[in-house]
């Protein structure tokens, strides 16, 4: 449609951008890396008509897609609380997060995801244009967490299979990964790393804790 083409031609006017310092929800203090550096993220919320279009894409296309029980971010009736619950009482725990999760999801990966949802190349291209900015997935839009979940789905399934084989509980809340068990599973950490790396993502070593 002509209106959508005009909007895409002026995408820069439909986004805001700022750098935010991460704070701990419980204490209100800045989150820091082990070396004392304050954690930051770039927020890029969409505005006006683009936000409305993205909300429609989310509600009509993305939200109805069923995701594994292990996925808790951006899923109705799931939260960071439901993400933590399955790990209660487990003796051994490994927590880590995905480095630059949103920026690592580029235009091509989003396009491939829409193709995987059986959209024609023409529509997949339009949907990708409407949900990415500066050739990557922006953090802070209605569609980004849902798209990120779908891009990471193949990796999720591999991690779920690995964990099921070894009696490990696995959950993911957006870019935070948690693994736990009653048994020591240190010997499985390399396999976890390999699966994440093969999926085209990186674990943040500064945020990994066993």
Predicted regions and their residues:
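Amphipathic alpha-helical blocks
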Residues: 1-15
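Short coil/turn segments at secondary-structure boundaries
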Residues: 7-8, 69-74, 126-128
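A generic secondary-structure signal marking the coil-to-beta-strand transition
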Residues: 16, 39-41, 90-94
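Conserved pre-motif C helix in the palm subdomain of viral-like polymerases
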Residues: 37-69, 102, 136-162
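Conserved polymerase palm-domain catalytic core
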Residues: 86-174, 178-210
């Amino acid at each position: 449609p002509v209106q959508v083409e005009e909007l895409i031609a002026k995408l820069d006017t439909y986004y805001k951008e700022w750098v935010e310092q991460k704070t701990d929800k419980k204490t209100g203090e800045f989150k820091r890396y082990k070396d004392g550096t304050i954690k930051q993220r770039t927020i890029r919320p969409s505005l006006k008509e683009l936000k409305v279009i993205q909300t429609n894409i989310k509600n009509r296309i993305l939200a109805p897609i069923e995701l594994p029980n292990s996925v808790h971010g951006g899923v109705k009736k799931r939260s960071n609380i439901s993400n933590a619950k399955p790990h209660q009482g487990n003796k051994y725990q490994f927590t880590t997060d995905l480095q630059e999760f949103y920026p690592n999801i580029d235009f091509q990966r989003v396009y491939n995801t829409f193709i995987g949802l059986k959209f024609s190349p023409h529509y997949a291209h339009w949907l990708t244009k409407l949900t990415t900015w500066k050739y990557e997935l922006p953090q802070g839009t209605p569609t980004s967490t849902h798209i990120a979940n779908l891009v990471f789905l193949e990796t999720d399934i591999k991690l779920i299979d690995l964990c099921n084989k070894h009696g490990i509980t696995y959950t993911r809340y957006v870019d935070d990964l948690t693994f736990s068990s009653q048994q020591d599973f240190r010997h499985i950490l390399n396999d976890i790393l390999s699966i994440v790396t093969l999926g085209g993502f990186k674990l943040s070593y500064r945020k990994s804790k066993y």
